[in-house]
């Protein structure tokens, strides 16, 4: 059969017409269908025979394409059609088809990894693409580091200290696109606009994501301090929210998102997220989060030592101040520190316009100096006031990035 076909095949270039090529394409399609049928039936001999015929047709079409540039207008269909045919079509498609397999592969890759392709399109950095894949694979720590490196020049400093999934907030500061793509991955396609709604209504998806993030980060937070950390995450959320200034909004979205997850992970936290999100006042955040469970504040002492190795004493003191009670904390944020009204107003806290807030602005910028600024500024009771921020920012931004 193959011999008969070979003899019937047109030989001269002048004989090649669109009808001839279309006829050959139709025959190729028929051959492919036959090959598939025989493969499903297990008839390898017939499959081999038809594959040889198909191979000759493809080689002939490739020869026409190479020899006659004018035929390119007639040949786009064969490569596209033959691409999906089978191994024979790919291997024998020739130069014109050689380009299509790559396109198909790239499409497959981008389709299989929509977050990665989205990230790559938004940021335009190859490393982000890789890091997104890693995120999908639950290697959040590694992802955070690579994201920090590629998305922000200052990010790597944080990735060293705590390469956990929490580096996402810092990514959000760099660009909303980063933040959105990271949000898609971590939240499983939950849009940023839905975060506030989700805070009030935890979803099963959030709980799953939170559980996975908790497992990924748990090695870094030894002991009970980990849960304290997740609770602590809620405190900054409210503060960050009102402080939506410039990039802090992006960061804020991440913080709220994480606070939602963490608040859901601990039953007592849900009311907190619901209450202080609407108001966005640090007072609410502190009253609810830090005072719902004082044991959780104590549990922070251990993690603070882990996080702030350089300033353990200061942070532990701050924690002690927290543990002292709701009344004191409120007075701290509201009365004793009018100069640091970053807590009551919170917007000022992040606003780069004020002295203490400069720490936060630096933090928004993702600079490693924040730790130093936190420690220095946190001398005396003011340190206690800032400590929730310093700690939580460390956990969400500085540390985990």
From Swiss-Prot:
Which segments carry the region annotation Necessary for interaction with CREBBP and for the recruitment of CREBBP to the nuclear bodies? 392-401
Segments carrying the region annotation (Necessary for nuclear localization) are 339-401
Give the record's keywords alphabetically. Answer: Activator, Calcium, Centromere, Chromatin regulator, Chromosome, Kinetochore, Nucleus, Repeat, Transcription, Transcription regulation
Q: Which Pfam families match?
A: SSXT (PF05030)
| Compartments in which it is found | Nucleus; Chromosome, Centromere, Kinetochore
Task: List all Basic and acidic residues biased stretches.
Answer: 295-304
Q: What is this protein called?
A: Calcium-responsive transcription coactivator
Q: Which organism is it from?
A: Rattus norvegicus
Its lineage opens with: Eukaryota, Metazoa, Chordata, Craniata, Vertebrata
